[in-house]
């Protein structure tokens, strides 16, 4: 365990306080920042690209774009993703750079039927890559509703060339205890992939426009 849950909740409460989080005219995201030490990112000491299901779903689900197969279409609709496209509709986006960029900006996850993955890579890839996003293949089963629902409550933890990662863990209107559970779930999921707590320099919680609050690791 990297840090006890009660210390996480203490930091979450501070991050949500008026002192650190002045009221805005919209519901802010709550983010977790993990800074690493004694690692060489260019050498690949830490490589993270993990989809982690949040145990306490955010009040607003993650936006998911889905391109199901014909057999998966009805079950995909039941999950009510943000955007659902047929393979033919995806094909029609070829060359529509503005529309593709808009889809890339507004959605967090891109779940694609396996027979449409190469097409999605060609059409969506150029807009997804610079945003740190990527197509994820749907399973081959005909019922993909539960799979899509899981991604509507999932967050992405990824690293690039900097020794840190920043990820969504909920929204400011959630109870602090729920947010703490989500932070705990993320830390628990990546603990085995970062060579242990000794490589963590600091962990912070913050709202999207608020001040970061450091979690006490001692």
Curated annotation (Swiss-Prot):
Per UniProt, the keywords (alphabetical) are: Repressor, Ribonucleoprotein, Ribosomal protein, RNA-binding, rRNA-binding, Translation regulation, tRNA-binding
Q: Can you name a GO cellular component term?
A: large ribosomal subunit
Q: Which residues form the signal peptide?
A: none
Q: Mind telling me which CDD domains this protein's record contains? A: Ribosomal_L1 (cd00403)
Q: Which GO terms describe its molecular function?
A: rRNA binding; structural constituent of ribosome; tRNA binding
Q: Please explain the role this protein plays, according to its UniProt record.
A: Binds directly to 23S rRNA. Probably involved in E site tRNA release. Protein L1 is also a translational repressor protein, it controls the translation of its operon by binding to its mRNA.
Its assembly, as annotated, is:
Part of the 50S ribosomal subunit.
**Protein family per UniProt:** Belongs to the universal ribosomal protein uL1 family.
* This protein's name: Large ribosomal subunit protein uL1
Say which species the protein is native to: Metallosphaera sedula (strain ATCC 51363 / DSM 5348 / JCM 9185 / NBRC 15509 / TH2)
């Amino acid at each position: 365990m990297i840090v006890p849950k009660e210390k996480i909740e203490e930091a979450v409460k501070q991050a949500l306080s008026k002192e650190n989080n002045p009221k805005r005219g919209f519901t802010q995201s709550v983010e977790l920042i993990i800074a690493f030490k004694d690692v060489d990112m260019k050498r690949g000491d830490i490589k993270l690209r993990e989809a982690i299901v949040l145990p306490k779903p955010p009040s607003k689900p993650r936006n998911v774009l889905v391109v199901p197969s014909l057999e998966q279409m009805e079950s995909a609709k039941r999950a009510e993703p943000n955007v659902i496209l047929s393979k033919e509709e995806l094909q029609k986006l070829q060359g529509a750079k503005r529309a593709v960029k808009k889809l890339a900006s507004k959605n967090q996850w891109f779940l694609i039927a396996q027979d449409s993955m190469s097409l999605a890579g060609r059409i969506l890839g150029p807009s997804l890559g610079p945003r740190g996003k990527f197509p994820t293949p749907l399973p081959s089963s005909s019922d993909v509703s539960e799979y899509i629902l899981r991604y509507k409550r999932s967050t992405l933890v990824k690293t690039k060339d900097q020794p840190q990662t920043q990820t969504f863990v909920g929204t400011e209107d959630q109870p602090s205890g729920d947010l703490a559970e989500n932070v705990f779930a993320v830390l628990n999921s990546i603990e085995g992939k970062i060579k242990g707590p000794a490589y963590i320099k600091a962990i912070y919680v913050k709202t999207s426009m608020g001040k970061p609050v450091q979690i006490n690791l001692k």
